[in-house]
Amino acid sequence: MQEIKNIREFDEIIAHDKVLVYFYVPWNNSSLSVGEILEEEKDNLSEYEMVKVNLDRILSLTRIYHITTVPDIKIFERGKITKDILGIKTKNELFKELNK
């Protein structure tokens, strides 16, 4: 999964169709667990362009997108948030939320 390095790169990527953005911090165990689930399931999530954002490196995105909890998964389509998924702990929960 590609890691976004800066806001300019982030803005370019989310302008695409169906982008799954995984917001995390490396010191949070829940964040790391969800990251592992996404990596394991990437073939089953191939309809999405998947990227990750380390919020310790791009802290301003927490204000822009009102991120108060990690991990946070947002689905963007052409720059607009179409889904916000919080509190995922298992792959079943992830797919249930994605299929709503």
Which positions does each model-derived feature cover?
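CheY-like receiver
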Residues: 12-13, 61, 97
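Local sequence-structure signature of Cys/Sec-based thiol-disulfide redox active-site neighborhoods
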Residues: 3, 9-41
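Structural micro-motif
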Residues: 65-74
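Non-catalytic, surface beta->alpha helical segment in thiol-disulfide oxidoreductase systems
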Residues: 75-100
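Absolute protein N-terminus
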Residues: 1-2, 100
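Short glycine/proline-enriched coil/turn segments at helix->beta-strand junctions
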Residues: 15-19, 45-47, 100
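Acidic phosphotransfer microenvironment of two-component signaling modules
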Residues: 8-11, 59, 92
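Thiol-based oxidoreductase modules, predominantly thioredoxin-like and allied folds used
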Residues: 3-5, 23, 39-42, 46-60
